[in-house]
Structures are given as C-alpha cells and as structure tokens.
Amino acid sequence: MEYKKILFQLFPDLENIGDWADWEENNTSLSAKLYNSKYIIKSREVEIWDDKSCIYNNIIYPKTGENLPCFGMDLMGFFDKKVIIVFDFQHPVENYLFSHPDLPKAEGTFRFFEPGNHFSENVFVRKCTMDQVNDYLDDFAAYLQAYKEMLESKKPSGFAVHSTYGDFDKYMKRLDPVSGYLSSKFGKEKAESLVNDFLFCYG
C-alpha cells in the first residue's frame, strides 16, 4: 500500500514494538501493530481486509510537553466505487483549532470531522474509487512532511500520556464508527478489546 510506504520512507526510524493482534475470522483478516521512535510514543496501526473491502487506520501520538497534534490517517475502501481517504493533524486539546499555514484549508463540512474539535482546519477528506486512491499520494506526503518537521523542531520528550491524550481518546472512542463492524466480524469481546485496549487505550 503506497500510503504506508510513504509513512515509513519519511519516518524510517519507526520501530515495531509489538504485534497486538493478528486475527482471521468470517473471511476477514485484521492486523494491529505498534511502532515508536525518538519523538513518537506510539504509532498504532490497524489493517482490516476481506474479499470486498480494506481499511487502514493509523494515529501517531507524539511524545508530550510541546503542545503538538497527533497525526491521523484513514483509508477506507468499502468496494471499488466507494473509498474514503482522510488525513489530518488531530490536536488532543478539545476546542483547539489547529491550522498549518502552508497547507490548504478544508472546504465544506464533513460528517465526523469537525475542525476545532480534535480536527484541524487542514483536514483532508476525499471520496474516490479504488482506481483513484493513489491520486492523493503527493498531498499525503506533504502533510506527513509538515508533521515530521513539527516533531523535529519541537523535539518532544514527555510521557504524560493519560493527561495529554485521555480526552482525545475518549472523544475518538465515541466517534469511532467501526465497533459494530468489528463485532459482526470478530465478536463483541474482541471488538471491545481492540477499541478499549488498543485503538483508544488512553481514554
């Protein structure tokens, strides 16, 4: 997947620190992995796929103390003609309107993605077909490069994860639309564990 390749090209020091899940049930596969690096507490990655759909989700949580946003990315392919791509700087402070001056501001409104409510003015949302997915690689690389420059400029070093990311994870847990889908594929117990213990464990 080209988006994932760009992530690891720009952050070559990301180290796999654990494979949290590797499931296969009801003709659906799920992989959940954790990475970290010098300035990143964790990059938590989930991939879900079956014969018709594929979902990639990753949120990068920087080390704390420098008022930095997280970086979130979603690639949700439900079938050939319905793909949703989202990436953004997701600030952990509620009602904090983050904006990067060198990147375009979002136009219009989007369900689930409200600028100022853990999403930035630059939130990038596109709906496309499977054939068009790679049309936005340059945009993704520009956003990710800007994020890398933030980290290298601020050099975060703290580990106050619950006080910094607790509200953010609680909000994302309420917002997250995949719990029902996960339950239908892997059962309620596994779905709740993934959401509470992996995806949003600080909340």
Predicted regions and their residues:
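Short Lys/Arg-enriched alpha/beta "domain-start" segment
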Residues: 1-71, 80
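Alpha-helical oligomerization segments
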Residues: 146-149, 153-203
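Extended, non-transmembrane interaction/recognition domains
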Residues: 57-158, 162-163, 168-170
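Terminal low-complexity, poorly structured segments
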Residues: 3-6, 10, 99, 166, ...
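Hydrophobic, Leu/Ile/Phe/Ala-enriched alpha-helical segments that form helix-helix packing faces
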Residues: 7-14, 18, 24, 140-154, ...
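Non-membrane alpha-helical secondary structure
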Residues: 2, 6, 132-139, 170, ...
